[in-house]
């Protein structure tokens, strides 16, 4: 069993359902501390955050990952227990295999080899791991970034191990992500008996025309890097459960995934304009999960492309799709951010898995990225 596969198996055995780490970070420390990496815990609340750094000089390269995983769901639906990793037909099965314990294993072994081959490398290397990515993300990377800023720590390059690949390892790299803006809207009406609508004010009926306008609005046309901004309603709640009561309040949860063509303020203003135009009595609160970011054709992107081509022969496609990642907290610092990891077809699903051969290939790609950036300086 290779070092990368061995570590991936050990990580998957830890039942680190968010926000638990379950000892995963200790496994990484055990492997990197002997190579000169200094470990520092930056924990907040129930979240464990680990900052491992080797060297103090610039430039600083950071591998970013998360040890927490989503719940496995019904255990009886799995072909093998989700936290008892099993290899079948060349695939490693287990919760977190692709998202993202396989990547963490590949990062770790890549760093081990790189430091052995280049003990006097220029710059510094670091690993940032959190146990709060799949959950609220309140006490994870966002808090660590604040600590690093207070120390004037500058991250030059950040490679996130999120599963970016689609059909083959390395066919897609993420060079950005859309922003995520959520809202909770409460339409206020007057409760009453369904037989006496003249004595009530139905918030569902009131909101229907506005909902139609919100869902058909063209928010922007996107650009060469991002698809058009999307608006989606995720939940609608109203009523008492009885069929003879007009509700007095309607609650709507919605989300925007937005491009660099729009600002948060512009979205908020347009939503409120639509609601006001329909004469609604409402309360509205917002939650910004992350701003859109984009890393153009910079050193990190070039180094990543070259490494993928050398190991797999592929020319990766740059993409900004998918959900949010912790890269959204690093990008505003000015760092170049790229996401590269295993195939994402099984993530968050029953029988999550990663190809065993992809683990070693990913580790080789990560090592080449380090060499492309640091070994030749």
Curated annotation (Swiss-Prot):
Q: What class of enzyme is it?
A: hydrolase
Please state the Enzyme Commission number of this protein: 3.5.1.18
Highest taxon above the source species: Bacteria
Recorded hits in CDD domains, A to Z, give: M20_DapE_proteobac
- InterPro entries, A to Z: ArgE/DapE_CS, Bact_exopeptidase_dim_dom, DapE_proteobac, Peptidase_M20, Peptidase_M20_dimer, Peptidase_M20A
Keyword annotations for this protein, in alphabetical order, are:
Amino-acid biosynthesis, Cobalt, Diaminopimelate biosynthesis, Hydrolase, Lysine biosynthesis, Metal-binding, Zinc
For this entry, the protein name equals: Succinyl-diaminopimelate desuccinylase
**Which lineage ranks, top first, belong to the organism behind this chain?**
Bacteria, Pseudomonadati, Pseudomonadota, Gammaproteobacteria, Methylococcales
């Amino acid at each position: 069993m290779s070092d990368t596969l061995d570590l991936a198996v050990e990580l998957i055995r830890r039942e680190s359902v968010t926000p638990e780490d379950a000892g995963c970070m200790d496994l990484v420390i055990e492997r990197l501390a002997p190579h000169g990496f200094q470990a520092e815990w930056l924990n907040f609340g129930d979240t464990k955050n680990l900052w491992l750094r080797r060297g103090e000089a610039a430039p600083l390269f950071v591998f970013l990952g998360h040890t927490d995983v989503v719940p496995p769901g019904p255990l009886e639906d799995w072909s093998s227990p989700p936290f008892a990793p099993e290899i079948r037909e060349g695939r490693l099965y287990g919760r977190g295999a692709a998202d993202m314990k396989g990547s963490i294993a590949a990062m770790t072994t890549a760093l081990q080899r790189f430091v052995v081959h280049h003990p006097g490398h220029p710059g510094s290397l670091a690993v940032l791991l959190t146990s709060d990515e799949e959950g609220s993300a309140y006490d994870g990377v966002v808090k660590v970034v604040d600590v690093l800023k207070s120390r004037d720590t500058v991250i030059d390059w950040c490679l996130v191990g999120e599963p970016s690949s689609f059909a083959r390892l390395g066919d897609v790299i993420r060079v950005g992500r859309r922003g995520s803006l959520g809202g909770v809207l409460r339409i206020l009406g007057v409760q009453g008996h369904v037989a006496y609508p003249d004595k009530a004010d139905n918030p569902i009926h009131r909101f229907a025309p506005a909902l139609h306008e919100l869902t058909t609005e063209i928010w922007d046309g996107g650009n060469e890097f991002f698809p058009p901004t999307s608006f989606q309603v995720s939940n609608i709640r109203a009523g008492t459960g009885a069929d003879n009561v007009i509700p007095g309040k309607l609650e709507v949860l919605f989300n925007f995934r937005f491009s660099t063509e729009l600002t948060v303020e512009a979205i908020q203003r347009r939503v409120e304009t639509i609601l006001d135009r329909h004469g609604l009595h409402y309360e509205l609160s917002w939650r910004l999960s992350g701003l859109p970011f984009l890393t153009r054709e910079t050193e990190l992107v070039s180094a990543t492309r070259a490494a993928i081509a050398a190991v797999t022969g592929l020319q990766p496609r740059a993409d900004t799709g998918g959900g949010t990642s912790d890269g959204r907290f690093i990008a505003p610092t000015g760092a170049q951010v790229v996401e590269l990891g295993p195939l994402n077809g099984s993530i968050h699903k029953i029988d999550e898995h990663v190809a065993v051969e992809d683990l070693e290939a990913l580790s080789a790609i990560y090592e080449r990225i380090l060499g492309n950036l640091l070994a030749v300086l």
